[in-house]
Amino acid sequence: MKKSLMMIAGLFFSVLSVAGQGLSMDRVNADFQKKKEALPTGDLFSVFRQQLTQEERDALTFFYAYMSVGDITDYSGDFYLENVRSSLTTRKETTWGKTIPDDIFVHFVLPIRINNENLDRARMVFHDELMPRVKGLSMLDAVLEVNHWCHEKVNYQPADARTSAPLATVKTAYGRCGEESTFLVAALRSVGIPARQVYTPRWAHTDDNHAWVEAWVDGKWYFLGACEPEPVLNLGWFNAPASRGMLMHTKVFGRYNGPEEVMYRTPRYTEINVIDNYAPTAKADVTIVDADGKPVADAKVEFKVYNYAEFYTVAS
């Protein structure tokens, strides 16, 4: 058995496939029809009977094609339509909106869900508060300003409960790294800036994990510590640890076909590897052989890092 791998700082992780480019609305529509057929009762798709522009219809179709059943049943169509309209309006009113490709917009601006938080009206609330602060700024400076705003609202405090919703995080004024990064992604998307939560499941240097944010600016992804403002992007306390990390990944809503390595696909999201943004990498091949030197078919390969007194599997 032969696997394609990528190496960083002497460690390996699995590369399962390489995605293509572009967004296929034909595929989105097909997935949407499957979702409708799977949920024939409850009138869960009634929002599509409203007067909608083609942009609104396409955006809602994308939402419903890849949302979980829980999100479809727990929140109304009007809730999703309000979020869609806010995102489309923001795209038109910002100077950077026209520079964002459609596939980046639908995967990294349009989606509401970031983690396992309850969904709320944060997009509209944050938009109204943040737009005056980012008006007239470049896209890069807007990212920095939004993070300053997040720092004003939320401080770090460790916790183990389910991820707090963005508006709940404002109310408590604290959150762990996963909540702070969820908060920053929600804030950036509210002003039309593509953003994604990045996660390393285990550090190589200490018994812990971490989550932070990447923002898309003028065609390139940059990282930043959530609610930890710095004067520039690609700077955080975790620069050195990330350069030694075994895996940095994010889950992208829908069928994403960007340039990053695809680790895993489900009917709802695409898990991608973004380790290239943190250290030089190289591809390597690992072949599993038996005692006679013959390749082993369907062998299970796991790549582990020592953390919390165990070898933790980060990819298999």
PLM feature spans:
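A short, amphipathic beta-strand motif
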Residues: 282-290
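Surface-exposed loop/edge segments in extracytoplasmic proteins
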Residues: 222, 307-315
